[in-house]
Amino acid sequence: VAVKKIMKPFSTPVLAKRTYRELKLLKHLKHENVISLSDIFISPLEDIYFVTELLGTDLHRLLTSRPLEKQFIQYFLYQIMRGLKYVHSAGVVHRDLKPSNILVNENCDLKICDFGLARIQDPQMTGYVSTRYYRAPEIMLTWQKYDVEVDIWSAGCIFAEMLEGKPLFPGKDHVNQFSIITELLGTPPDDVINTIASEN
């Protein structure tokens, strides 16, 4: 088993909400490509411990150790998308999909983990989401109106990183991130830009 320690989860309202949300989601999400929660306990110091299955490494460590062969890339991407399909069908947006939140065992079985930033789908979302390299443009432009597509964008960024061996959009900040995206993908046509509404 693996044990995830959350120190002082009740020290702030934000941390308490995040811990509760992750616990609630892990309790209900049951899929072979999503980490499963087997137990939970609280220490006398009020630290919380999530007990999950043990997988040997994460995708980030694999990517930094050696290039991946194409058949592994295909199998990993298949499992990521399969796990996301299940998570999304449950009405959940992960919001922080990145290689270090994807666990892998010695049989190349893959599981999505770390649901601390995940949310039930809602017309009004919050802006604090996803590690910058894997952040969808709509979060940068209209951070309150996004949906499961942001996880698909992140999965695409992870796919490109598996192929290239490095992050596709390694932005230093929001502006640089968006600049790198438009340099690679081009500027959207005016009719697309005109459909983007921002309340920021």
UniProtKB/Swiss-Prot annotation:
Sequence motif TXY, location on chain: 126-128
Required cofactor names: Mg(2+)
Localization per record: Cytoplasm; Nucleus
Pfam families for the chain: Pkinase
Coiled coil location: none
Disulfide bonds: none
A GO molecular-function descriptor: ATP binding
PTM description: Dually phosphorylated on Thr-126 and Tyr-128, which activates the enzyme.
EC top class, as a word: transferase
Cellular compartments per GO CC: cytoplasm; nucleus
Modified sites of kind Phosphotyrosine: Y128
Active site per UniProt: D96
Taxonomic superkingdom: Eukaryota
UniProt note on regulation of activity: Activated by tyrosine and threonine phosphorylation.
Residues of the Protein kinase domain: 1-200
Chain residues that bind ATP: K4
Bilayer-crossing regions: none
Gene3D superfamilies given in the database record: Phosphorylase Kinase, domain 1, Transferase(Phosphotransferase) domain 1
Enzyme Commission number: 2.7.11.24
Function per UniProt: Proline-directed serine/threonine-protein kinase involved in a signal transduction pathway that is activated by changes in the osmolarity of the extracellular environment. Controls osmotic regulation of transcription of target genes.
Family under the similarity heading: Belongs to the protein kinase superfamily. Ser/Thr protein kinase family. MAP kinase subfamily. HOG1 sub-subfamily.
Domain comment in the entry: The TXY motif contains the threonine and tyrosine residues whose phosphorylation activates the MAP kinases.
Name the record gives this protein: Mitogen-activated protein kinase HOG1
Native organism taxonomy: Eukaryota, Fungi, Dikarya, Ascomycota, Pezizomycotina
Encoding gene (name): HOG1
